[in-house]
Curated annotation (Swiss-Prot):
It comes from the Eukaryota. The gene is Naa25. The keyword Cell membrane does not apply. This is N-alpha-acetyltransferase 25, NatB auxiliary subunit. Keywords: Cytoplasm, Repeat, TPR repeat. It holds the Pfam family NatB_MDM20. Its main location: cytoplasm. Belongs to the MDM20/NAA25 family. Component of the N-terminal acetyltransferase B (NatB) complex which is composed of NAA20 and NAA25. PANTHER family: N-ALPHA-ACETYLTRANSFERASE 25, NATB AUXILIARY SUBUNIT (PTHR22767:SF3), N-TERMINAL ACETYLTRANSFERASE-RELATED (PTHR22767).
Amino acid sequence: MATRGHVQDPNDRRLRPIYDYLDNGNNKMAIQQADKLLKKHKDLHCAKVLKAIGLQRTGKQEEAFTLAQEVAALEPTDDNSLQALTILYREMHRPELVTKLYEAAVKKVPNSEEYHSHLFMAYARVGEYKKMQQAGMALYKIVPKNPYYFWSVMSLIMQSISARDENLSKTMFLPLAERMVEKMVKEDKIEAEAEVELYYMILERLGKYQEALDVIRGKLGEKLTSEIQSRENKCMAMYKKLSKWPECNALSRRLLLKNSDDWQFYLTYFDSVFRLIEEAWTPPAEGEHSLEGEVHCSAEDAVKFIEDRITEASQSSRHVRGPHLAKLELIRRLRSQGCNDEYKLGDPEELMFQYFKKFGDKPCCFTDLKVFVDLLPAAQCTQFINQLLGVVPLSTPTEDKLALPADIRGLQQHLCVVQLTRLLGLYHSMDKSQKLDVVKELMLRYQHGLEFGRSCLKTELQFSDYYCLLAVHVLIDVWREAGEETAVWQALTLLEEGLTHSPSNAQFKLLLVRIYCVLGAFEPVVDLYSSLDAKHIQHDTIGYLLTRYAASLGQYAAASQSCNFALRFFHSNQKDTSEYIIQAYKYGAFEKIPEFIAFRNRLNNSLHFAQVRTERMLLDLLLEANISISLAESIKSMNLRPEEDDVPWEDLRDNRDLDVFFSWDPKDRNVSEEHKKLSLEEETMWLRIRSLTLRLISGLPSLTHPVEPKNSEKMSENGVSSRIDILRLLLQQLEVAVETGKRFIEKEIQYPFLGPVPTRMGRFFSSGCCQCQVQSFHLVSDMYELDTSGLEGTVDIQERIENSLASLLELLKGVFSTCKGDLLEVTDGNVKTQPAVLENLVFFVETISVILWVSSYCESVLRPYKLNIQKKKKKKKETSIIMPPIFTSFQDYVTGLQTVISNAVDHIKGLEAHLIALRLEELTLEETSISTEERKFSKTVQGKVQSSYLHSLLETGELLRKRLETTKKLKI
C-alpha cells in the first residue's frame, strides 16, 4: 500500500488545484483546469470525474453523467476516482450507482477492508438490507472484527422490519439473527454494549421477554453502562410486558429510595400497587417478596411510603418536588377507586396551597399544579386563588397604584396565581368590561415587570412576558365571543410591543402569525415566521401555520417562497436520514436505526408534505401555464400524469403540532383529541379535492390531438380514449370528494382559536368556485365527445355544450359577486376587516385560470371544424352551408369571459384606490386613554395590514391582467 501511495503522490499534487476550485465554488475554473490536465494525462480518470462534478454544478447534468459513466465503465479501483464518483452520484441523487461502483471495485480487490466497508455503506444508503447482510459477513470473513459481524445481524433485523409478511419476519429473519448472536454468546465473543443492546432488541421483537430479562439481569447486562439506569429501565419494561407487578413495584420502590424526585418511577410504583390490589396479591410467608426485594401491595403501604418520602425530603437541604406531587397523584388514584377518606391524606386544596408556598417562585410551579386542579371543587376555585394571593409578597395598593411585587421571586409567584386563575376559568366567566379591566391590569404588571429584565440579553425572555401573553389571550376571547375587532387590533398592538422587549419570544411571533393570517395579511407573516428560525422537523410540525395561508391570500411570490422552503426540508430528509443510519452503523447505535427508518417514513408520508407539494404545483400552473409557457410544457416539467396519484392516502401521517400555542384555558375550552381527529379528516378531504383538481388539469394537454372524426378505433389504438376515461373517472372521484366535503362543512365545526386551523374548503364551496371548476371539467368531457363524433348528427351534444358555456358564465359572475366589498372599512374611528373578500378573490383568479385552460382545449377542438366548413364554403361557393350555432355560442362565451375578467381588474383597481385613500391617522383604537407608546404600535399594526392588503391586490390584479391577455387569444 505504501508503494501505491507513493506512486499516487504526483497525481494528488496535480489534482489539488481542481479540488480547491470546486471547494471554493469556482466550477468553471475547475472544468478548465481538468481539461488542461486531461490533455497531458489522458488516463487520469479522477480529473475526468472532477470535471463532471464541475459540469453538474453548472447545470450541465447530461454531459456530467456521460463523463461519469465513461469512468465508471472502466471499473476504477483508485481511491480518488471512487470518492469523486461517490460525491458526484450523491449530488445527482443516484445513490444506487455508488453500489455498482463498489461492487466492481470489490471484485477487483477482493481483500480490501475499505472497499467492502464502502460497499456496505452504499447498500445502507439505498436500503438493500439483504445485500447489506451479505456484505457484512464478507467483511467479517476478511477482517474478523465484531462490529462487522453485528452489521450483518442488524441487517437481518432490518429485513424483518421491512418485510410485509410479519410471519416471515418472526419465523425466518429474527430467529436467524438470534442464532447468530447466541453463537457469539456461547463463544464468549460479546465485547461491546451495542452488541448486548442488539441481542435485547432481537429478543424483545420475538416476544421472548423472559429471555430478554435474563440477558439484562445476567452477566451481559453489566455491559449496559452508557446511560444512567439503562439496565433498570430495560428490566422495568420487561417486567411490565410479563405483568410481573411485584418485581415492578419492588424495583420502582428501590429506585425511589435512591432518588425520591424521579417522577417516572412514582407512576410505575402506583400502577403496580393498584394492580397488586386488584389481583389481591399477597407476599409469600417465607423468603423474598420478589426478585427485586420488598413489595408494597396495599393502599396503606403506598400512603406510608409517600409520607416517609415527604418527611425525608423535609429533612434534606435539597428541595425536591416529587414526593409532594406524588401525594396529590395518590389522592387522585384513590379517589378514582372511591376510597380516599379512609387514608386521610389531606385536603388537595391545602396540599396545593402548601406546595405553592414552597415552590411558587419557580416557573415550574404552574405546570406542576395544572395537572391536579381537577381535584378542586368548582365552588372552591375563587377561595383557592384568594388564598394563594394572600401569601404573595406585594406592595400595598393605593387608589391609582396596583399591588406590585418588589422582586423577581414575587413576580413569579403572582404570575403563577394569574395563570391558575385563567386555568380555573375565572377569567372566562367575566363580562366584556371586566375582561378589558383584566387586560389593563395585566399590561400594567407587564410594564412594571420589564424593570426586572433590563439586563436581559436580546436572546432572553423578559420575566413578565406571560402577563402580556395572558392579556392577549383575554383579548382574543373578547374578539371571538363578541365579534369586536377593536380587541384583535389591541391584541396585535400588545404583541408587537412585547416583541420589541423580547425579540426571541416564539409565542409572541406565533400569535402574530396566527392573527395576521386570520385577518388576511400575509406580508408581515413571512418575516415573522422566518425569525422563528424553525429547525429541521419543525418545518413539518409548525409549517402548517404559514403554508395554510400561503396560497390563499394573493401574495403569490411569497407563497412560492414559503412552499419551496418547506419542500427543501422534505427533499433533504431522504438524504440526511441515510447519513444518520450510516453513522449509527459506524458507532454501533443499532437501536437507533429502526427509529431513523420510521422517522424517514413518517416524513415521507407527512400530510403537510403532500399538501405543500400539491399546492406548489397548482401555484406554478396558476403563475406560468399559458402565460410564460404552455400548459403542456408546465405539466411536462413537473412530471405530472393524471393516472398517477403520488399521495400515500393509506399511510398519511399528521405531524402537525396542534399544541404549539401556550394555553391556560380550562380543559373544556382547550384543544381536544376530537378536534384533532376532525381537523385531520377535514385536511384529508381538502387535500383529496386539490389533488384531484391538479390531476384533472394535468390531463387536459393529452386530449389535444389531430382529429379524425368518427374514427374511434384509431383513437383507442393510440391511447387517447383511455385518457378521457381517466379524466372521467377523476371527475367522478372529485364529485364524490366534493359531496363528502360539503357534508363535513355542514357540521359547522368550531375549533378553538389556538387549535387546528380550518381549511379553505368552506370558502371554496360558499364562493361558488367549486361548482364552476367541476362544471368546466364536465365541459371537457362533452367537448371530447363532440371531437370524436364530429359535428354531424351531434346536435344534442352541441346544445349541451352551448348550455354549459352559458351556465358557466353565469356561475362565474356569481363568484365575482362574492369578491365585492372593501377589505378595510372605517366607521366611527373603528377598523373592520373583510379577509373573506380577499380569499374569494384569490379563488376567483384560480377558477378563471382553470376555465381558461379548459376554454383553450375547447378552442383546439372547435377551430379545425370551423376552418373545415369555411374551406368547403369557398370550394363549393355555396351559401347554403349553415354554420352551426356552437361557434357563435363559444365566441359569445369568450366575449363574456373577457367582460367578467375586465370588470374584476377594474374592481381590484377600485379596492387599491380605496386602500391608498385610507389615512392611517383616522385608524385609532376605540380606547382613547391608550399611551403614546401603544398608539405608535397601533399605527404600525394597521400600517402592516393595509400594506399587505395592497400588496395582495397588486399581485392578484397583475395575474388577472395576464389572464385577460390570454383570453384575447381565444379565437376560432
